[in-house]
Amino acid sequence: MKFETTKNKLHGNAYYQAQFQDPIKFTTGSATPASYNQFIDALRERLTGGLIYGIPVLRDPSTVEKPNQYVTVELSYSDTVSIQLGIDLTNAYVVAYRAGSESFFFRNAPASASTYLFTGTQQYSLPFDGNYDDLEKWAHQSRQRISLGLEALRQGIKFLRSGASDDEEIARTLIVIIQMVAEAARFRYVSKLVVISLSNRAAFQPDPSMLSLENTWEPLSRAVQHTVQDTFPQNVTLINVRQERVVVSSLSHPSVSALALMLFVCNPLNATQSPLLIRSVVEQSKICSSHYEPTVRIGGRDGLCVDVSDNAYNNGNPIILWKCKDQLEVNQLWTLKSDKTIRSKGKCLTTYGYAPGNYVMIYDCSSAVAEATYWDIWDNGTIINPKSGLVLSAESSSMGGTLTVQKNDYRMRQGWRTGNDTSPFVTSIAGFFKLCMEAHGNSMWLDVCDITKEEQQWAVYPDGSIRPVQNTNNCLTCEEHKQGATIVMMGCSNAWASQRWVFKSDGTIYNLYDDMVMDVKSSDPSLKQIILWPYTGNANQMWATLF
């Protein structure tokens, strides 16, 4: 069913710039993994309004003028057959598409969409909204049963360009296009699955992880922007490929690196922000609430938890590492207060002094030296005492070892993750094109991704270590602290800086101490070498967790 909408005549430079900005183009006829990556990167760049905690974020709707609210994407089947999509840059939603001299708008498209998109065409309203619930109802198929891939995209472009009025097929086709364009722009996980599909020349269906990410984009964006001391005020629950729950409680959780674009929710008061978020925009934007004081566990070395020794709260009792208990118990629960104290049962995590090696204890907050009770939790998993510049460290590898403060060397023993689920995050790690990290004895290299292979399963611990599920006593380790050092498997017992990694929002796996990233040597997987190398942004340094 088609309904012609009202077409408005527009004037002004703002309209001209928005309407006639070149569309971002992707040609399916000669598509390669590289050309698809270039397309998605260009779309992400066009949609990005700034960075919050280093993660690209869309524009604040309150700062966007209506004529500048939309971007266009051109998808080509051939030199003569193509369609265009209209995308709302405040939420990355597809709101309309153009097929020749006609254009079609979702029923729930913003009122301004038909005013500023495809104005030289005959405009029609589709009989359904652009959300998955409505699209699946009209398609008579769920997303998980609709195949994605290059051929599905090509046939979808050809079908929409034909002008056929089969609403069921239109809805099904739009489900394909929305996921391969908009969702891929939002999530590295999705774009990586498409790249693997292009490499294999094989169709794929959305897995539980992909669907889970699509369904939780807004809650995950909200949680990141409301982060307090690296901790989400509310957990976000994802589903992995094995249909298991993955509880995400902190900004440093590796699954957060799947986010390539966030929905704008609010500006964190103290977040590191990009210059793109200019002062006048930030001043107009909504500021996140800062009243959250989450109560969480703190997981660290070897997956053990920060614990008040013997559950004794007398002043001076040491803080130790202990096995995380099956139930949430008070001596392993810590409230992250807005005054920068970290409290268990109302008493403060306190450093005995400001020299390396001083032990950390529980102490009455009102009688302790205030500066000894203050801590900052960074988004790389570091917990630092601002007065001394020293960091919380687990020097002993044994359960029951007393925590101390030490010089910040970004060692594995100095890595932490907050949240009530501090268990290791189990995932495959996809890298250069269609290949995944695979463990072999003391070595690691890339092979064709197969989530059923145990060699491709990795456990990412709260301390920042990456361990093969086959043997979690081994850690991915750079052999030397220098450019070109090979990354191998070594025992985790030393908890070195060479064994601590951060999954960054730019798609890299980053070593904090060396300020370098994992790199497929010479972009040649046949060499079977992953090395440490300065950041270049090239495809051989891009990784994604496939959990």
From Swiss-Prot:
Effect of residue 219 to N: 7-fold more potent in protein synthesis inhibition in vitro
Residues spanning the membrane: none
2-gamma repeat intervals: 514-547
1-gamma repeat copies, ranges: 388-420
Glycosylated sites: 380, 420
GO MF: carbohydrate binding; rRNA N-glycosylase activity; toxin activity
Catalytic reaction annotation: Endohydrolysis of the N-glycosidic bond at one specific adenosine on the 28S rRNA
Matching SMART domains: RICIN (SM00458)
Keyword terms: Disulfide bond, Glycoprotein, Hydrolase, Lectin, Plant defense, Protein synthesis inhibitor, Pyrrolidone carboxylic acid, Repeat, Signal, Toxin
E.C. numbers: 3.2.2.22
Ranges for the 2-beta repeats: 472-511
Positions of 2-alpha repeats: 433-468
Free-text comment about domains: The B chain is composed of two domains, each domain consists of 3 homologous subdomains (alpha, beta, gamma).
Family named by the database record: In the N-terminal section; belongs to the ribosome-inactivating protein family. Type 2 RIP subfamily.
Name by which UniProt lists this protein: Agglutinin-1
Organism: Abrus precatorius
Lineage of the organism: Eukaryota, Viridiplantae, Streptophyta, Embryophyta, Tracheophyta
